[in-house]
């Protein structure tokens, strides 16, 4: 009885240890997947851009650069090849030598500049939109300035007719004076002709006096 009793509790101990190991393995695998970092395509483009070789970067040199960056090249060899093919098909990389994933690769300057230009254009358009609103205000101010100039110009036009009217008025008195001067000598001439007419009745008065004298003689 004493021999069989201690054997029973020893059996469940190894059964408890096995699930702990499985959990630890799962956690380690999950940690590796999480710390994988950026995608392969980004790492490849960075490695190609960093190289100064004119002929391009070979696959072996690419793998070395990726390994130096901390990327597991041996496990992700197929991913590197697929990433290279996709980058070549997109136009971000240009294959200078070889075919497929093997060969040497170079950054496509046109594609890189094309990606940079739209960003620069958007930033430039955003900057240009802001001064456009500010530029509208000076236009309004310019419109008011032109209106002020037009109002200033109009009195000048009004002054010219006034000056012309003044000049005409100044000229007209001269004419009036001339007419008055011409008319003035005529009136005394008329008066001179009238005076001899008034003298004629004086000659008729002696004629009426003659009959009075004859009547006195008859008496």
Swiss-Prot record:
SUPFAM superfamilies this protein is in?
Answer: Winged helix' DNA-binding domain
Which portions of the sequence form the region Disordered? 1-41, 92-219
Q: Which residues carry this modification: N6-methyllysine?
A: 26
Where the record annotates domain H15, the positions are 36-109
PTMs? Citrullination at Arg-54 (H1R54ci) by PADI4 takes place within the DNA-binding site of H1 and results in its displacement from chromatin and global chromatin decondensation, thereby promoting pluripotency and stem cell maintenance. ADP-ribosylated on Ser-55, Ser-113 and Ser-150 in response to DNA damage.
What PROSITE patterns is this protein classified in?
A: H15 (PS51504)
Q: Which InterPro entries match?
A: H1/H5, Histone_H1/H5_H15, WH-like_DNA-bd_sf, WH_DNA-bd_sf
Phenotype when inactivated?
Triple-deficient mice (H1-2, H1-3 and H1-4) die by midgestation with a broad range of defects. These embryos have about 50% of the normal ratio of H1 to nucleosomes. This proves at least that a correct stoichiometry of linker histone deposition on chromatin is essential.
State the source organism's domain of life: Eukaryota
ADP-ribosylserine is carried by which residues? 150
The N6-acetyllysine modification is found at: 17, 26
Q: Which Gene3D superfamilies match?
A: Winged helix-like DNA-binding domain superfamily/Winged helix DNA-binding domain (1.10.10.10)
Q: At which residues is Phosphothreonine found?
A: 18, 146
Q: Give residue spans, biased composition: Basic residues.
A: 20-35, 119-140, 149-160, 168-185, 192-219
Could you state one GO biological process linked to this protein? nucleosome assembly
Iron as UniProt keyword: no
Renumbered to this chain, the Low complexity biased-composition regions fall at 1-15
Please provide, in alphabetical order, the Gene Ontology terms of the cellular component aspect for this entry. Answer: heterochromatin; nucleosome; nucleus
Where does the record say this protein resides? Nucleus; Chromosome
- Cite the domain annotation text: The C-terminal domain is required for high-affinity binding to chromatin.
* Name of the protein in question: Histone H1.4
Encoding gene per record: H1-4
């Amino acid at each position: 009885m004493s021999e069989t009793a201690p054997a029973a509790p020893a059996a469940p101990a190894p059964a408890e240890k096995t699930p702990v190991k499985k959990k630890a393995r799962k956690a380690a695998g999950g940690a590796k997947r999480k710390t994988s970092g950026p995608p392969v395509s980004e790492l490849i483009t960075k490695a190609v851009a960093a190289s100064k070789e004119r002929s391009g970067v070979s696959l072996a040199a690419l793998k070395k650069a990726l390994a130096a960056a901390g990327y597991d090249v041996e496990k992700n060899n197929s991913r590197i090849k697929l990433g290279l093919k996709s980058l070549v098909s997109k136009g971000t990389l240009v294959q200078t030598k070889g075919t497929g994933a093997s060969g040497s690769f170079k950054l496509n300057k046109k594609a890189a500049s094309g990606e940079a230009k739209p960003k620069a254009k958007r930033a430039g358009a955003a900057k240009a939109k802001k001064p456009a609103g500010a530029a509208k205000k000076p236009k309004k101010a310019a419109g008011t300035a032109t209106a002020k100039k037009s109002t200033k110009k109009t009195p000048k036009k009004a002054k010219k007719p006034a000056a012309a009217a003044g000049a005409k008025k100044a000229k007209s008195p001269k004419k009036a004076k001339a007419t008055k001067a011409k008319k003035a000598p005529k009136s005394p001439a008329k008066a001179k002709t009238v005076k001899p007419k008034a003298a004629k009745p004086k000659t008729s008065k002696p004629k009426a006096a003659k009959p009075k004298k004859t009547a006195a003689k008859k008496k």
